[in-house]
Amino acid sequence: MRLAIRALLACAVLGLCLAEQTVRWCTVSNHEVSKCASFRDSMKSIVPAPPLVACVKRTSYLECIKAIADNEADAVTLDAGLVFEAGLSPYNLKPVVAEFYGSKTEPQTHYYAVAVVKKNSNFQLNQLQGKKSCHTGLGRSAGWNIPIGLLYWQLPEPRESLQKAVSNFFAGSCVPCADRTAVPNLCQLCVGKGTDKCACSNHEPYFGYSGAFKCLADGAGDVAFVKHSTVLENLPQEADRDEYQLLCRDNTRKSVDEYKDCYLASIPSHAVVARSVDGKEDLIWGLLNQAQEHFGTEKSKDFHLFSSPHGKDLLFKDSALGFLRIPPAMDTWLYLGYEYVTAIRNLREDIRPEVPKDECKKVKWCAIGHHEKVKCDEWSVNSGGNIECESAQSTEDCIAKIVKGEADAMSLDGGFIYIAGKCGLVPVLAENYETRSGSACVDTPEEGYHAVAVVKSSSDPDLTWNSLKGKKSCHTGVDRTAGWNIPMGLLYSEIKHCEFDKFFREGCAPGYRRNSTLCNLCIGSASGPGRECEPNNHERYYGYTGAFRCLVEKGDVAFVKHQTVEQNTDGRNPDDWAKDLKSENFKLLCPDGTRKSVTEFKSCYLARAPNHAVVSRKEKAACVCQELHNQQASYGKNGSHCPDKFCLFQSATKDLLFRDDTQCLANLQPTTTYKTYLGEKYLTAVANLRQCSTSRLLEACTFHRV
């Protein structure tokens, strides 16, 4: 009896273990069930141990999404539109593995939707009303969903019938698959014969990517909505392509070869989705990675992962070449991209915003942590609601919110401007620290500040830049300019490895791994334990003043800006730890191995650093710029209501929302990118340090790299 019970228990445990090691793949047809069974059996033949495959059948992709959310299945491959659906509540699924196309040496996980026009025409994207349009087909991504979603707020009222609204917007169109009886204007330009006119197939000559481009080339239409490769595929000669241009979202034009800087939206590839919590994403990746190694393109004669005798695009697209794992920090909205999500939201009545996203009524500022949120809320009240506040626990979380449209702007140090730029954000206004007079300050951004290494004058004279190994270090924060990117970039070029926690004996580098020696010196929040080494003001050693305090109380060297010592000594900081400090009690370490007075920073610094700058999404930049100029007129250094009501550039603690020594926010050229703002030298330094990067957001933002 006991043996029987033990056997039953063993079987139960084994069953649970196998269930935990099995990926339940959701299928939507009998043909998919057949391929899934072949997939399951083929995996067993080469990998008898887990991960295993089990097949679950549902009647539609939406039913598969529900099954995964309810833990009745684990995975299914979806197109971008369904990835969007799966990411919504109550499903909350996330993409975990992407199909890639193109080539294995240059894998492509997305394509660009573009608007193509003839070069000799003279209108912009905001002047399409009354023009003639060519579309790949009704409901298709590049040819309909993206352009119509982005143009939605320009469409004439009423918009309840989207097809009728579009037919009233354009003078004439060819939209294959449209109802030519109900909305004849959408089929007016089509050239199919008889019942093939406006057909949802190649029987309509203007159907699909090449068809929509032919509609433009023939002179039937004024604009064609296609994908970025369409012109190249149809016009391989550069001279012929030169007759066409792209319409950009900022109402300019570029050549058809400049599609990466002039597109309507990036449309990501099909992706495997899973639950956001307990979603088996490691197991799913392990399964698919092994599957592509054994059954990928030209790998096996018996089972083919990316084709099937049972039909087309079963389980995966036949055109896929393989899989790439999606970074953990990449949720549905980062995977799909802001432009794509905006377009799809506009087409969905149930989730459409009440006002167009580009309407400049309010700016939503992103605050990091509790102290910044308190200041932001005070700013919001004084602004009369023109400023709203969103908050997150780290700078990277705030950047992600801006990328996804959940916030609009924040001010960043150069290291985070680099990450924000890689995520598609642009610098809008620069903080100025030296220039004090009104218009001269606003119209002239400064060249930057100096990143320095500070030590105590009383420290061993042998403590120099060349003898930092084994010392205790204090940093403003990981990925910040003066406190991390510049000094660690210089160190990396000397030591040729990324193990900074072994180079320094211990330190405080907010944002580093919590169990590392580079978090040993951190002291966390005054309100209680548990916030040590957080990259926000809950960590009292965070930021310039925090890193300097770390030096005063615990460290051997602090990496800060050149103004930090001056701002916290000689009575300028009344806090208990700083009130008795003298500037002459500190020295700078020079890269040549000498030490100098803190006043000699111009001849003893590690590198020039770009000033902090406000960043936003490109389409929101003009609005952010306009509103912040209004705000600093009231609450800036010489604002009409500072200090009696509120001051933008003052903080209860240090450097909240902006640096406290900011004199004004200065205009930048509208064409400024993160690259031009940061400068070539700084970009090179940061790029060299990227192989040491711990930034999960940077990994996510550079996933769609082609």
From Swiss-Prot:
Expressed by the liver and secreted in plasma. The modification Phosphoserine is found at S391, S693. GO terms for molecular function: ferric iron binding. Pfam families: Transferrin (PF00405). Hydrogencarbonate 1 binds at T136, R140, A142, G143. Hydrogencarbonate 2 binds at T476, R480, A482, G483. SMART domains: TR_FER. Fe(3+) 2 binds at D413, Y449, Y544, H612. The modification Dimethylated arginine is found at R40. Monomer. Part of a complex composed of SLC40A1/ferroportin, TF/transferrin and HEPH/hephaestin that transfers iron from cells to transferrin. This is Serotransferrin. The gene is TF.
